[in-house]
């Protein structure tokens, strides 16, 4: 590694330390087709837990699809729908012809289109030809489930910075349509879509899930524990050793 330790992005494998319990819990929940929420301050390790869990499931031979939509710059309904749709479609196809075919197949009767000029200019797979309405939201939210059912494979949809949906005037309608979908979940169905909801603005996430009680009993919350100091120290020491340097454990402790 170029630096003693990774700190500027999510980590998996040998760079992932601690929180094995959280990974086990998340894996079991995904195996059961549950929807998951976790939140904490920025850079607290949310995405590392998610990615390590998926890494572990791949290593154990599990077959699944994954879409990751970062909502960090979402400020309105249209931006959310396009981010969501683009992530979901791109995760299961790879060419312009395939993108257009999937949008035509799954999003018929909506205002969603595949715009080749938008795709060429900004890599936008799903575009809108009109102001979105609730039918558009309804069909878009259900898109991962339809793909999972047809391909007979679980589909995990990661929504990062989920709290930003509240910046859209229609956020209440969006949440209620998501709740409707979550209530319809069939635990006996082997191929279903599971949403992994992550948020970095703790107060906003608490407002959604604890104060207003959206998704009440429809999602399972994973609480992140503090990484043990001993694991952190060992990781730092090993990181310096890889780069040919030695650091005393007492120095790491600040003694």
For each predicted feature, which ranges?
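P-loop NTPase nucleotide-binding core
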Residues: 32, 39-44, 48-156, 165, ...
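Conserved nucleotide-binding/hydrolysis micro-motifs of P-loop NTPases
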Residues: 33, 72-76, 162-164, 200-205, ...
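Short glycine-/polar-rich loops that comprise or flank the Walker A/P-loop
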Residues: 62-66, 191-193, 216-220
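A short helix-turn-beta junction within AAA+ P-loop NTPase domains corresponding to the substrate/partner-engaging
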Residues: 208-225
